[in-house]
Amino acid sequence: MKNTKLLLAIATSAALLTGCQNTHGIDTNMAISSGLNAYKAATLSDADAKAIANEGCAEMDSGNQVASKSSKYGKRLAKIAKALGNNINGTPVNYKVYMTSDVNAWAMANGCVRVYSGLMDMMNDNEIEGVLGHELGHVALGHSLAEMKASYAIVAARDAISATSGVASQLSRSQLGDIAEGAINAKYSRDKESEADDFSFDLLKKRGISTQGLVGSFEKLASLDGGRTQSMFDSHPPSTERAQHIRDRIASGK
């Protein structure tokens, strides 16, 4: 019964998409005709989703200039990573810097954390700790895993891929890149963003890191809300509101 309802929901969603095109450039008629494949993708196991994240992260790394460990960015990130830890709820975490002026950072379900040099130029280490704590929150709370599955479902519908065990090894580099891009560009709900903010606050306190950096990061990102478009918080709730929420938590001591 549960699977029948899921298949019906996918078919209904596909029908509602008629006349529209999503960010992956999928023809909606193709999406409708591939409803069964989307259903299979929706039942993708957590293990396969994380395997796809592993391959997708590697594909993203290959398409970007990664800062060396000996560079000023690499050394700064190593210090930040040591403070935050290399394991989140049992998931190993690895950190790298992409050399690009974009202001962004993201994390995938497999613990792949990437921060852009544009963000590091804009913020101090404590502020970056706050931002990365937020991204780790999406991993720990299952948000990243859900988005990886959703992104896979979209590409599966487009390319008629079935969700068989070990599917990651069957995907092309182009498909992996599309899935990864879809996952890291996900627009989370306000509730999920707030949950990740609170996770970051709690993580910083647990690790003995100042929570003021989280406030500072929001204040700096607030300056981008009405200007530059390539910001990690373009689709997030207003940064000013988020900064105030963290101030309130600091004041309450909780």
Q: Across the structure, where does each feature detected by a protein language model lie?
A:
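A Zn2+-metalloprotease active-site environment signal
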Residues: 2-8, 18-254
